[in-house]
Regions:
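An N-terminal hydrophobic leader/cap segment in hydrolases
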Residues: 2-66
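Conserved alpha/beta-hydrolase
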Residues: 107-126
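Catalytic nucleophile-loop/oxyanion-hole region of alpha/beta-hydrolase
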Residues: 120-150
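Gly/Ala-rich beta-loop-alpha elbow adjacent to hydrolase catalytic centers
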Residues: 158-166
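Hydrolase active-site cap/lid region
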Residues: 171, 175-230, 240
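Short beta-strand/loop motif that positions the catalytic acidic residue
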Residues: 243-244, 250-252, 256
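Conserved alpha/beta-hydrolase "acid-adjacent" motif
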Residues: 257-263
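Catalytic histidine-centered segment of alpha/beta-hydrolase-like enzymes
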Residues: 281-294
């Protein structure tokens, strides 16, 4: 009997250790910073992008917004289209403003401004990720700042985690700045937080069944949204997409193994939006693979022209 109890205790401890390690892996993703961009030979700050249309080097401003007593860093670039909207880019899990630079390259000719920020626990921002629970509040603060500084029309664009944050920020928001949001672009969105968590763990060869469920349950409890992530209000991004009062464009790769294309379709349909399915597209690389980058840019261009 003693041996059985000892083995059971050992199994319990081992399980809790795996769950704890999984929680840490999910809530503290690798930080994508200037050094990581340099190691891959990619731009690490806005000034390293291609020159402006007139041949002048790209310039930008650095500033921060306050969120939960934390300063979140922002890059603010001037675009080439004076009559275009300001576009605010919100990154995915494990990404940062560095990843936004790839998209900024395509957006600068279409926008009057391109604004990029690091969410908590990513890039150069302090803290740990909030997993999309309330980052929309920080994004709303950012929208207010952008509008107050001279941009009356704003497009929100995000990918993966940032796609859901963008949809949530623009939905059912009645403050004055909300009327300045003229469109939302969601790249590789997902409906529920557990979906990319399971798929990311699977891709990394880690336990992704009930271990992931337990880990996300503990994370939800810690973030105040409950074990099932709906203590205060549902997380489901489809629900918030249905509340949008502006056009929605969804870009989704059909080979996406992190955010299912079915989620993107459901979100687009809820908002009566436009879904661009990319047959060769995966979760990553839509803007660095030539075939998908061209399709994404054309959809982006047409959307910005439509809403500006």
């Amino acid at each position: 009997m003693g041996l059985v109890l000892l083995l059971a205790l050992g199994a319990l401890v081992a399980t809790l250790l795996v769950v704890g390690w999984t929680i840490r892996a999910i809530t503290r993703p690798p930080r994508r910073t200037y050094a990581s961009a340099l190691a891959k030979g990619r731009p690490g700050e806005p000034s390293q992008l291609m020159p402006a249309a007139d041949g002048s080097p790209r310039t930008f401003e650095n500033w921060t917004i306050k969120y939960r007593d934390v300063d979140l860093p922002v890059w603010d670039m001037r675009g080439d289209a004076n009559d275009g909207p300001a576009v605010i880019l919100s990154h995915g899990w494990g990404d940062s403003r560095i990843g936004a630079l790839t998209r900024a390259h395509f957006l600068l000719p279409l926008a009057s401004r391109v604004v990029m920020w690091d969410m908590p626990g990513h890039g150069d921002a302090p803290g740990s990720t909030r997993m999309g629970v309330d980052e929309h509040e920080a994004l709303r603060t950012l929208v207010e700042r952008v509008v107050a500084s001279g941009s009356p029309r704003v497009v929100l664009m995000g990918w993966s985690l940032g796609a859901g944050v963008s949809v949530r920020a623009a939905s059912n928001w009645n403050d004055a700045a909300a009327t300045s949001i003229v469109g939302v672009i969601a790249e590789a969105p997902y409906r529920l937080a557990i979906t990319p968590a399971r798929n990311m763990l699977r891709a990394f060869g880690m336990p992704h069944g009930w271990i992931a469920d337990w880990a996300m349950g503990f994370i939800g409890a810690d973030l105040g949204v409950g074990w099932h992530w709906k203590k205060t209000e549902p997380f489901d991004r489809q629900k918030y997409a249905a509340q949008l009062r502006m056009p929605l464009l969804v870009l989704h790769g059909e080979r996406d193994d992190i955010s299912p294309v079915a989620d993107g379709e459901a979100i687009a349909n809820a908002a009566n939006g436009t879904l661009i399915r990319l047959p060769e597209g995966e979760h990553h690389g839509l803007w660095t693979t030539e075939s998908t980058a061209i399709a994404c840019y054309e959809a982006l261009r047409d959307f910005v022209i439509r809403v500006k």
